């Protein structure tokens, strides 16, 4: 697969997709972390 770096609509579309994908992963990780913290707090307060 050959990647041509050329600023254009396709490049911007790919960039947007990559950003969306990465931010999706980041949000997922943050949510998982929040759940872990919540479980830890429940155990400590119990």
Curated annotation (Swiss-Prot):
It comes from the Bacteria. This is Uncharacterized protein YqdA. The gene is yqdA.
């Amino acid at each position: 697969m050959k990647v041509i770096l050329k600023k254009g609509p396709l490049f911007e579309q790919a960039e947007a997709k990559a950003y969306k994908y990465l931010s999706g992963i980041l949000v997922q990780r943050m949510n998982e972390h929040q759940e872990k913290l919540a479980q830890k707090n429940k155990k400590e307060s119990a």
